């Protein structure tokens, strides 16, 4: 059993991390083929897609796992979750498509980009429960194959469209059009591959069970909204607060250099995948607090090294990830974004206290506080510092979330962190990175 657990964890890890590595290739392709204005448009719309994915799944994936492991109503849970998401997604598709012109006018984007965005959000929502079903059934290989296949197909289509399609066609519709077209095709292919799961589960709806699942899912939805705002809405605020003629280009250079933080993100994601199951499995061990402290210290040491390494060799990494010099003006933000993501990773490590003590609502509260800070500091700093203000707002937000979790964690579940060692190492990493 343990052997299968480790194998599945490794496979799910690959399915999570490998697509993110592939997106690095997409970033290089986009900044090579798109000007800063077009890349800014793509990045701005993509933020809304992230929020849309959260809203259209409304925490149902987490509720699915919780209720599948709770009782004997497994078939009812499967069919209720699938029916709920299918009906709500198709309803959204109908309403959003009818209002597509109004949405495009309100957001100030081309209508074809908005339509593609609607399709992508709906297609992604329709595969939430099929993917959850695969994980619940232990079909890790198929899960990883479809996840990686989706990203690989998207990458291949992007390479074809932007490199080999007639340049006259790209000039007529814009490169952003073909980026979203590739995403729609890849998402549609994923849905087609997973359609047999729809047949296995069947459509039935149990209202009383659905109400219970929605009550459980609501805090997850709030935390998801907060995450989407914290992670990407600085682009929305940049477009809102900067002059219209320069906003998209500024978002473009900011988003490209922001991608340099992906190395820290990959490290944090891998850490979460590996350590969260361990946190729960060792919660009853009398030495658990000491173990948690040691794990956090190791994480900070490794994260500090990544911060220092990427910052020192930024001039090398920019040639790999951002070969277009037009985007280099925003490289100033790289150490700030790396440090912000390190703070977020430390926050995830510190969050063990409310997970093992069943105070999970605290996570939603901290995320909402972070969202409020994101909004406040973006509005305060962007008019003054432009994209530098957006980067600083991200650092302040994640730093505050980390500090709040540490403060309350020590009150409710004291963990003997070696504060002096952490301060010295983290301080030295920051000092030599700026």
Regions found by a protein language model. Give the residues of each.
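Alpha-helical transmembrane segments of polytopic membrane transporters and translocases
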Residues: 28, 38-56, 219, 250-268, ...
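Hydrophobic alpha-helical transmembrane segments
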Residues: 115, 145-198, 368-373, 387-408
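Transmembrane alpha-helical segments of multi-pass transport proteins
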Residues: 105, 370, 419-434
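Interhelical loop/hinge segments that connect adjacent transmembrane helices in multipass membrane
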Residues: 1-5, 172-179, 192-231, 274, ...
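Signature of the first transmembrane helix
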Residues: 3-61, 89-99, 120-121, 154-155, ...
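Specific pore-lining/lateral-gate transmembrane helices of multi-pass inner-membrane transport
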Residues: 67-84, 253-367
